[in-house]
Amino acid sequence: RANSALPIAGRYRIIDFVLSCMANSGITNIGVATEANYSSLMDHIKSGKPWDLDRKNWGLNILPPNLEKVSYGSIKGNIDILAGISDFIHRSQQTYVILSLGNSIYNIDFEEVVKNHIESQADVTILYKDMKGMPEREISRFTTLELDKENRITDIEVQPYYPKSSMASMDVYVMEKALLESIVDECSARGDRDFVKDALVKKMTGLRIYGYEYTGYTDKIDSLKAYYRNNMNFLNSDIRRELFNSKNPIYTKTKDQSPTKYGSDASVQNSFISDGCVIEGTVINSVLSRGVKVAKGAVIKNSIIMQDSVIEEDVELSHVVFDKEVVITKGRKLIGQESYPLAISKGTKI
C-alpha cells in the first residue's frame, strides 16, 4: 500500500494529518495524486466525508496517474505526477496552490502560511523545521535550506550526506497556480523530473523563494524505522496533546465496532488500543489497531500490531511491526530492536 495509507496511532492513517490540516484551514478543493498501490488509500478517503469534503463543487478528488499524459512505467519523479494531473490543476479556480507529501506528520494552520506568503511577496514559500541538535544522519533524510536574515532561501541541498544547515524542508510548498503550471510545463518540455532539483534549485536567482518556519512536531514516514519511531512517539503525552488538539482536530474514517474487551488477567500500560480488540494478556508501550486479539499469558512490548492480528497464548513480542491479519501461534518469541524493528507482512502465520 501507499505510505500515506499506512495505519498510525492505532485508528488513523498517515494522510489524515495533511487532509485534516487543509480542511481545518478552510481549503475546499483538494486533489490527492496517486502513483501506485492506491486501492487502500481510495478505500480510506473515498468521498472525503470525515473531512467535510463530500461537496457538489470541488471537495476531495482522488487523482490516479493520467496514462494519456504520462505512461505508467515512465513516472520517475514528482514533475511526472504533476504533469499527469495538469487538467485538474488547470480547472481549479483558486489563485494559490499548496503542495504537500501525503506521508508527512504535522498539525499546522495553512491560513497563516498563505497569509505570510502574500505579505512577503514570495513567489514560492517552503515550510521548514529547524532540526538543530538532531544527528546528521537524521537531518540528511530531508532537503536542507539555507536562509538569509529576511528568511529568503539562498541555497537548497537535496538529502545531503553532510548537511550544512539544520533547516529541514517539510516538502510543503505554496505558490500561485499560474506559476506551478508554468514550472510543470517547462520541466516537462525539457524532460526534467524533480520539482526541487530541476525547478526550484535552477530558478533560485529568478524567483523569490522564502521559508516559513514551523516549530511544532513534524516528521515524514519514509522508512520502517521512521514509521516505528513516530508510532512510539505518539505514546508521549506532550506530542499527543500537540498533534491531537480540539482547536485543530485530526479527522479519520470511523469504523463501527464494539468496544475493546479486557479479560480479568489483562494488563495494559501506556498503549493505544483501538476498538474491537480482545485483551487477555499484557500490552506495554504498544499500538494496537482494530480487532487485535491478545490471548492469556501473551506479552507485547514496544510494538505495533495492525488490524485483526491474533497473538496466541504465551507469545512474547518486543519491538515488532505486524501488518494486518498476522497470526502468532502459542509460545512463539519474536524480538526486534528499537533501531531495527522486526517487520512481519500481511497474513503471515508463525
Put a short name on every predicted segment:
Residues 1-233, 344-346:
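Unchanged
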Residues 178, 186-350:
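Left-handed beta-helix
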